[in-house]
Regions:
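Nucleotide-sugar donor-binding catalytic core of glycosyltransferases
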Residues: 1-141, 163, 177-199
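Two-component system phosphotransfer/interaction surface
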Residues: 149-160, 189-193
Length: 199
């Protein structure tokens, strides 16, 4: 099994803003590519090309890569290609980078962190300002607690088996709780159905 991975598209936001995490995601990938390539694998679409840039020029450049693909992108050592199943890939790793597209938004928690937890992989999360209102701190590694990628990496590498297993036990307990069930797809379907029936 692998150490750490990430699954994402190589894309950027249309207009730069201070709360976006697309660029932070790329910074983390680049750090691993340079400093710890053997401990990180990157999956997804488009990473054979350089990281996407925001704005009109960035979109034009990205479209050009569709016609003139790069023979080797920035992530030559870490990029492992496209995937068929997130669950199968994540299940082969101890940790996964799962940054939301934006930080600081309350309640903005997408499937990224849950994909990791359901796969038995410990998420390294950055996103919702109030994530701890929904998910216990013992269930994920909060990227906000580290000043840079080096300190995050040192923490991951120093984690012993007991601590790792404790994370997994806490994740399993959380996923089996009522607190987690509000994020299940069945709950969304029930809510949508109830709204439709009320009309």
């Amino acid at each position: 099994s692998g150490f750490c991975c990430a699954i994402s598209w190589n894309k950027a936001i249309r207009y730069p803003c201070k709360s976006e995490l697309y660029s932070k995601r790329v910074e983390t990938y680049l750090w691993f590519e340079k400093h710890a390539p053997l401990d990180f694998d990157l999956y997804g679409v488009g990473w054979e090309n350089p990281p996407a840039k925001s704005g009109m020029i960035g979109r034009v450049i990205s479209k050009l890569y569709n016609f003139f693909p790069m023979r080797s992108g920035v992530f030559r050592r870490c990029y492992k290609g496209k995937i068929v199943s997130k669950t199968d890939v994540l299940g082969d790793y101890k940790f996964a980078i799962c940054y939301e597209n934006y930080k600081g938004l309350k309640g903005y928690i997408t499937e990224k962190i849950f994909d990791c937890m359901f796969s038995g992989c410990i998420p390294i999360y950055w996103g919702a300002e109030n994530v701890l209102d929904y998910i216990p701190s013992e269930c994920f590694i909060d990227r906000r607690n580290f000043k840079d990628e080096q300190s995050l990496y040192d923490f991951l590498k120093s984690m012993d088996a007991i601590t790792f297993n404790t994370y997994q036990e806490k994740i399993a307990a959380f996923l089996d709780s009522q607190s987690a069930k509000k994020f299940y797809i069945e709950n969304y379907v029930d809510k949508v159905s109830s709204v439709i029936l009320e009309r």
